[in-house]
């Protein structure tokens, strides 16, 4: 089989092509889509590797392998390797070949100041011509060829995600409350400062409690500023989250910060978790809530 997407089969994507044509960008994009990626696997080992993955009991369903000129000594029996894949039951595979014209590849090598692996002491063009000859048979086996000559990395990433991303693939959102006095979280993709909201810390009965307590949450939520802020914030997130999902982002960390991370940020984080939990996989966590007890 040569088409990806059969739920009952292990999906194997083989990525090959010219050095400098974008294989690294492709693999990074596939990793973000949840593919199990293996770089520089000799072609002769592909059937054995596929068999091992099948024996994993379905824990690995989508695999991407990169094969290139680093394994050139194993390219001689490529036809035998492909025939072995064709005869494997429960395997759906697709070969993607990334290419670019000589001028573009030479330009990319000059920009990165890297030497072509087949021309360590000569011009990049000599190595490019040698690589084309080496990969000629592999290109003939490809189910799809993408010419990246006119593509920027972000455009190639978008194409890979659109083609191999699963429709409706889940975006996992971690809403994280924190206190600025303990430092901002370094892994937050989006961060919102709610220190302008009314502070329960100055209400004696509420001070020992947290934003998870109903009376504290009610105190924070009842104010006009909070209601207006949440309306604008939910509108913003409601617009941006689907776009993050379409771009292939699998995880998003939203930081909500107040002074100590005990009252306001906790209440707002809990509210956002409820608001977006119906449409996304949402996890709410409170980094600093217990530090203030």
UniProtKB/Swiss-Prot annotation:
Keyword Hydrolase set for record: no
UniProt feature coiled coil, ranges: none
InterPro entries recorded: P-loop_NTPase, RapZ-like, RapZ-like_N, RapZ_C
Residues given in the record as ATP binding sites: 17-24
Listed GO MF terms: ATP binding; GTP binding
UniProt: GTP binding residues: 68-71
Gene3D superfamilies documented for this protein: P-loop containing nucleotide triphosphate hydrolases (3.40.50.300)
Pfam families: PapZ_C, RapZ-like_N
PANTHER family: RNASE ADAPTER PROTEIN RAPZ
Function recorded in the entry: Displays ATPase and GTPase activities.
Family indicated by similarity: Belongs to the RapZ-like family.
UniProt-recorded name of the protein: Nucleotide-binding protein BBR47_52620
Record organism: Brevibacillus brevis (strain 47 / JCM 6285 / NBRC 100599)
Taxonomic lineage of the native organism: Bacteria, Bacillati, Bacillota, Bacilli, Bacillales
